[in-house]
């Protein structure tokens, strides 16, 4: 049993995965097996329609799969934001067709959540190795200014052709690489959480994520250059991370402190040169900070700490609340979340 087959044995949602070159024609066969006698509805944006959506539509048609008219988002600034959830919800509410998402993070998350809203499953055709959310339980959507994870099942099936992913803009693969390398400090964080009894280790999920990292991350230059084999390794590592999250119904196997930096910057609507920053890039910078802290911790002679003195010096809740309000400049959105999350640790 290979790594993917082993991971699929524990997944709660995804039951089929095909990853390999020239695999796009297998979309029709997978659809018919997973959704017999159902209609299909291809969901894409302008870019993903061009690189794969039109082909998927034609492949399904050629195999005799009945289809609704494809739904292609036309906004060039499409984002995983609640307004677009409403847009796709409206489309799906008027049909019983099964969505076939063609895209990466944004298209997949929008389709994942809207499929759940409308009481059906979906499948996805990946177009980039840009993040680990394809096969993860839950969708990351911005609502009321906050990036939130909404509970919803992962796709029932997925197809990814690394030829297509390798041809995507290099920044997408770079984002995926950063998201995957973050699993190293995330794994260390989990070991620490397990050691203090906070979040118990799941050995299977831990190994699904960690065992293939060295291979998947071994050639960043090859990934950047669009080497198909290296992008395929990267994509497999990302998908395995998603499967681990499915198995545990938690993001714990694939994220740690480095992701908290990303969530904060999501709330601050971080932009670079006027454009939103990808999840992977934010996590990548968070990884630098997280690993720096871990290195500092390893260099600290914790056995010499005066625990009683540290406890006595701990600030009162009133002082902590004042710090939260000062740090977040009394912004009600940040203060409310900061208070709730800090109280949960006390």
Per-region residue spans from a language model:
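Solvent-exposed alpha-helices and their adjacent loops that cap or buttress functional pockets
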Residues: 9-11, 34-35, 91-94, 115, ...
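A glycine/threonine-rich phosphate-anchoring loop and its flanking beta-alpha core
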Residues: 116-215
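Short beta-strand/turn micro-motifs composed of small residues
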Residues: 43-44, 103, 160
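Active-site histidine-anchored catalytic micro-motif
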Residues: 102, 131-135, 277
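A short, small-residue-rich loop immediately preceding and capping a beta-strand
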Residues: 92-114, 118-128
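Active-site segments that bind and position negatively charged phosphate/pyrophosphate groups
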Residues: 208-346
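ATP/NTP phosphate-donor binding region
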Residues: 1-98
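Residues that form or flank phosphate/diphosphate-binding pockets in enzymes
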Residues: 51, 109, 168
